[in-house]
């Protein structure tokens, strides 16, 4: 996964972005070729990561931050 500089805006490390997507607890596909991943950082803080799905299936992370409560409902048991 490639990480766009905009995904670092909130100070989330690249390794945590990758960890959250690789260990996602919820993945929501959007109508505009983006995906929302909700998953843990390496320290178990829940993150929200948005990626753009490219032709060929590769993804570009464009947003990452601590998960907002509005996404709690998407998690198992949420």
Where are these regions (language model features)?
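Ribonuclease/tRNase effector modules and their secretory precursors
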Residues: 1-78
